[in-house]
C-alpha cells in the first residue's frame, strides 16, 4: 500500500497527529498546569490524564473495544472532555 502520495512539507510533523497527542504532550511538558472548566472544576493535566485513563478502563470493562463506535450523550461539560480523549485513546470511535 502506497502511503506517500503527497510529498511531505518541511513543516509537517514527523508523527501522526492524534487526539491523545494533545493530552500526552501537555502532560509531558506541563503536568501541573490546570484545566479550568467554567470556574467550577479544576484539574491538573496529570489528574485529568488519570481521569481519562480510568474512563477508558471502565469502558473497556463494559466491553468496548478497538474499532467500536461509542455515542456520547453530553456536550460542553467536563465529562464530555474526558470522553473526548478516552474513547479514541482506547481505539474506539
Language-model regions: role of each:
Residues 1-17:
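Flexible, non-catalytic linker and terminal segments flanking ANL/adenylate-forming cores
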Residues 14-35, 50:
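A short N-terminal helical cap/helix-turn-helix that marks the beginning
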Amino acid at each position: 500500500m502506497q502511503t506517500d502520495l503527497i510529498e511531505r512539507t518541511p513543516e509537517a510533523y514527523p508523527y501522526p497527529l492524534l487526539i491523545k497527542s494533545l493530552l500526552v504532550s501537555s502532560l509531558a511538558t506541563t503536568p501541573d498546569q490546570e484545566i479550568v472548566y467554567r470556574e467550577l472544576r479544576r484539574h491538573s493535566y496529570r489528574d485529568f490524564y488519570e481521569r481519562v485513563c480510568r474512563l477508558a478502563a471502565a469502558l473497556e470493562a463494559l466491553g468496548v473495544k478497538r474499532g467500536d463506535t461509542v455515542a456520547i450523550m453530553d456536550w460542553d461539560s467536563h465529562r464530555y472532555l474526558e470522553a473526548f480523549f478516552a474513547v479514541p485513546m482506547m481505539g474506539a470511535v
